[in-house]
Swiss-Prot record:
Catalytic activity: 2-deoxy-D-ribose 5-phosphate = D-glyceraldehyde 3-phosphate + acetaldehyde
Protein name: Deoxyribose-phosphate aldolase
UniProt xrefs under InterPro entries: Aldolase_TIM, DeoC, DeoC/FbaB/LacD_aldolase, DeoC_typeI
CDD domains on file: DeoC (cd00959)
Recorded family membership: Belongs to the DeoC/FbaB aldolase family. DeoC type 1 subfamily.
GO CC terms in record: cytoplasm
Function comment: Catalyzes a reversible aldol reaction between acetaldehyde and D-glyceraldehyde 3-phosphate to generate 2-deoxy-D-ribose 5-phosphate.
Gene3D superfamilies noted in UniProt: Aldolase class I
Biological process annotations from GO: 2-deoxyribose 1-phosphate catabolic process; carbohydrate catabolic process; deoxyribonucleotide catabolic process
GO molecular function terms listed in the Swiss-Prot or TrEMBL record: deoxyribose-phosphate aldolase activity
Native source organism of the sequence: Ureaplasma parvum serovar 3 (strain ATCC 700970)
Gene label: deoC
Record NCBIfam families: deoC (TIGR00126)
Amino acid sequence: MNKYNIYVDHTLLKADASLEEIHKLCEEAEENEFYSVCINPCFVKVAKHYLLETSVKICTVIGFPLGANTIETKVFETKNAIDLGADEIDMVININQLINGNREYCLNEINQIKEVCGDKILKVIVETAFLNREQKEFAAKIILESNADFIKTSTGFAKEGAKLEDIILWKRILGDVKQIKASGGIKNFEDFKSFIEAGATRIGTSSAIKILNNH
């Protein structure tokens, strides 16, 4: 096994993903010993069936991709996803509240969802494409203060994805207290490796097979 495979959340979040593609994603994750598959909630149950006797985790997304659902809706989505078999939750923060510096709202949202997660991993997507440097620092400090496990760069649906400078910034703020997931537009091994070296402990990509088999 490639030593980098364990960092991978093998991702398929496109709106027109087919059941056959989900099955293939799961097979690839098992064969390559990726950490998880990251899929939309409607596929969690079937992916759990495919991966039942493997070590591959099931990761799904909440409030995706805009983050604009109410807290109550996100809490329900989270509980439902876990009931269906999700091991990890990648939630999109309320981006408007984050941009406007509403610390109390952001913390309340994250912590309510983490309460439902229990011992399941919670990653918080802050969609860096919409944030300036000061807002990225604020986002990291929110995560540091919250009960979340990870901060995550992007949904993959915005105009920009992961940037090395953001991983470096967050690692400086978070240290080893919280983890970092880089995602969005990661298509080559050089970027993949540089994100890990900068402090990311998980990489979300739909191109993992190409990236890791060709380096």
